[in-house]
């Protein structure tokens, strides 16, 4: 039986599910950019790509060389194809305008070019997260600059989302709104090949992922919930849990999509004006879309993340996502 490449899968989606051809082309271009990023990441010290740039992004985070390289790869790959009205990235303060010499399309691409880049220098997994939205008609123009308000749509408006994870294998995990598929990069073929047909998250779990060093800063409902997880079979939940933490959202969520679990990044008291650390538009929304499509759940502790109306490109949120039973339990504690 012949293997199904990403290109073949997308063509079949166009035929059977009426996936628009321009969306298919856009996903293929993003995938090609991810292959190029994977190649740059794999070179490591041999390619002179390790270390920091000495600059900060809009989040106030020090930019790694590979943050900037990955951002440029995605911009250059996607700006000329005629599929996009604009792009936005973790590494840029403002939306990226499609150069006037290129035609504009109907979609918006939002991405974190290299999630978990603090892991680069220790050779741990990193990844690229992306979200695709339709550009509202009132903001579509071939001649005028794109208004950033075009991007401020709730996650329910996403038409596609996914991530590439650069680990022992490079994988692309994708949803078009009809389940979640996983594609592994065959470097000999140069193609992503369908290897995970129907990714599903179990409703129950005995694993959780959270940065325990922040425990003293958490709100009371989170303190209560995590203490119950740690109490194991002697506590109110009556079962033992294991904790995992990779310090890259893409890697922790990939594990949850592979075998279940709960990922948490709660808000804390150090920056009370900020509702969380992770960014809604290009981290929480695409990952929540994937998790829900795989049968899991995702909230900010109070409401479904995909229902949140964004107020800015770089808005932050608290995140609880993964196996439905545990997400619902953590959310219920916030409402008591």
From Swiss-Prot:
Print the organism lineage: Bacteria, Pseudomonadati, Pseudomonadota, Gammaproteobacteria, Pseudomonadales
Q: Which residues bind substrate?
A: 115-118, 211, 277
Q: What is its EC number?
A: 3.1.3.11
The UniProt gene name for this protein comes to: fbp
Q: In which pathway does it act?
A: Carbohydrate biosynthesis; gluconeogenesis
Named cofactor requirement(s): Mg(2+)
Cofactor binding: number and manner = Binds 2 magnesium ions per subunit.
Please state where this protein is localized. Answer: Cytoplasm
Q: Name one GO cellular component term.
A: cytosol
Similarity field: Belongs to the FBPase class 1 family.
Question: Signal: is it a keyword of this entry?
Answer: no
Query: What organism is the protein native to?
Result: Pseudomonas syringae pv. tomato (strain ATCC BAA-871 / DC3000)
Q: What InterPro entries does this protein map onto?
A: FBPase_C_dom, FBPase_class-1, FBPase_N, FBPtase
Q: What is an example of a GO molecular function annotated in this UniProt entry?
A: fructose 1,6-bisphosphate 1-phosphatase activity
Listed name of the protein: Fructose-1,6-bisphosphatase class 1
- One GO biological process from the UniProt record? fructose metabolic process
Record-annotated disulphide pairs: none
Give the catalytic activity. beta-D-fructose 1,6-bisphosphate + H2O = beta-D-fructose 6-phosphate + phosphate
Its quaternary organisation is: Homotetramer.
Q: Where does Mg(2+) 1 bind?
A: 90, 112, 114
> Per UniProt, where does Mg(2+) 2 bind?
112, 115, 283
